[in-house]
Amino acid sequence: MRRIVVVGGSLAGHGAARVLRAQGYDGELVVVGGERHRPYDRYPLSKAYLTRSVDRAGLAIDDPPADVVWRLGERAVRLDLAGRQVVLDDRTRIGFDGLVVASGARPRDIDLVEGVQGAFVMRTIEDAETFRSSLESGTRRVVVVGGGLIGAEVAAHAVHQGHHTTMVDPSDLPTARAVGRPVAEHLQRLHEAAGVHLRNRTRMRTLDVRAGSVTGVVLDDGSRLPADVVMMATGTTPNVEWLRGSGLHASGGLACTPTLHARGSDRVVGAGDVVRVPQPLLDGEAPRVEHWASTLAHAELAAANLLAGPERARPLTALPTFGTTIHGARVRAVGFPQAADRSRVVWGSVEAGQALVALARGRQVVAVVSLAAHDHLPSLVGQLSPGTSLDDVIGTDVPLTSGQPSPKRSGPAVAGR
């Protein structure tokens, strides 16, 4: 291959470019990125970056790939697959022999907050910095719309900074899709104890904007929450518009094979938030995965398989993994908690703040979650395979931390999400 183009200048794109060079690719390598910054790590933006535990330099990604043509501040707007060209927003055409699609995803409500003072999404360095500044300029009434991981992290940060904080979520239990019901119930208790006002089973109808500044949030029941600051954390949309009409399958994300080749082209691979890959634990369903560790795994495998070709390509085996700390509670999950409809505590006590939980869809275990028990999580991860049921999962005999209640060796399966 004389030229490989990587569309996406964030973690996945950077990782793919680095691996291509590390594996001996010596042709021309072009990286197209919509932001003007060199690639940086977005993971801490809603965490350590908000608390100033990490500065801009700490977001920089180490080990930059050598001899790369960086096209930063430019966006791909069209893919001519037959002609093997990527068309940029300035109408420049870049030919390729191999293509890495790593164009990521954007906040679902980015257009809603554009130009509105006091309304934010969390995606870029600038997003995090302006939101942080708004919290540091005095006591504020903060409304967080969306109770997923980012929403929960932001709400926890805001309330601990002394702000009147409300979190609005359409589900009956925020973060349940991310960590399963048992741990989500624990996090809800922590939110309430910290002073976060929870408006579950509630949707936002619109922002209340006056003279260009947000003044509140109008809910679906017609009530209004006054607000000086609003964070929209309602999920993301994959950046696939530039792939439409190319012949690739890109509805809801770029559809890839288990080797991360795009369905329909051996010259195209995908990595990161933008791709959908069939998962054996989910009977071949192909969800998008938006976690830091998965992005790195995708980037490494996609780059290697692009060079190897489809005949020698290896399938993706790495399971999604993520971790977070909310109100001091350390949580780590492996697998697909969002798919679960049953759960079982296999070790410890969620109420005591230390537990291992297995999550299943029907009988198939699809995820395992640790609450302050990360050292013991690998024993459960090794049991995540097709055919493993909740009844098959074996916990650990390691006792709880001194002073904790005695272990709860197992509990009944609980229906519901």
Over which residues does each language-model region extend?
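Mid-to-C-terminal Rossmann-like scaffold of FAD/NAD(P)H-dependent oxidoreductases
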Residues: 2, 276-374
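Glycine-rich Rossmann-fold phosphate-binding loop(s) that bind the pyrophosphate
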Residues: 8-11, 123, 145-148
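Flexible, glycine-rich terminal cap/loop adjacent to redox cofactors
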Residues: 7-11, 15, 19-26, 34, ...
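FAD-site-proximal beta/loop scaffold in flavoenzymes
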Residues: 117-139, 213-218, 223-301
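Rossmann-like NAD(P)H-binding beta-loop-alpha module
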Residues: 130-179
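A Rossmann-like FAD-binding core segment of flavoenzymes
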Residues: 26-28, 70-88, 94, 161-258, ...
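FAD-binding core/adjacent interface of flavoenzyme oxidoreductases
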Residues: 1-5, 65-142, 220, 231-233, ...
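Beta1-alpha1 glycine-rich phosphate/pyrophosphate-binding loop at the start
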Residues: 1-70, 157-178, 379
